[in-house]
From Swiss-Prot:
The protein's name in its UniProt record: Large ribosomal subunit protein bL20
CDD domains documented for this protein: Ribosomal_L20 (cd07026)
Gene3D superfamilies in the cross-refs: 6.10.160.10, Ribosomal protein L20
Job description of the protein: Binds directly to 23S ribosomal RNA and is necessary for the in vitro assembly process of the 50S ribosomal subunit. It is not involved in the protein synthesizing functions of that subunit.
Gene Ontology biological-process entries: ribosomal large subunit assembly; translation
Species in which this protein is naturally found: Mycolicibacterium vanbaalenii (strain DSM 7251 / JCM 13017 / BCRC 16820 / KCTC 9966 / NRRL B-24157 / PYR-1)
Gene Ontology CC annotations of this record: ribonucleoprotein complex; ribosome
Matching InterPro entries: Ribosomal_bL20, RIBOSOMAL_L20_CS, Ribosomal_protein_bL20_C
Amino acid sequence: MARVKRALNAQKKRRTVLKASKGYRGQRSRLYRKAKEQQLHSLTYAYRDRRARKGEFRKLWISRINAAARANDITYNRLIQGLKAAGVEVDRKNLAEIAVSDPAAFTALVEVAKAALPEDVNAPSGEAA
């Protein structure tokens, strides 16, 4: 059987792994085995956190909407309920952007939501107390 020399392939493989692990701390950026292990973990974290980022942004949008809504004397929950009742279809991302960049438009949306809400939410649906 012929002898297989893999020096160039192995060097190239190690070089690419070490290049990708540049910026890691300590041995993880200098030793091939440690760098390879860290790279596998890094890819796992990146995959996981790309999905987690979506939830984090939603939390941020809700916080911004709630802060702007409370400045207009309504809670986030009642605002969303009122917008749904009024048939206003605006997602949380755009609602947060409006709250930050255009407070007058957000105030108009709050007024629409307040108008669509019933007076007493806890009252039975057939009779108003």
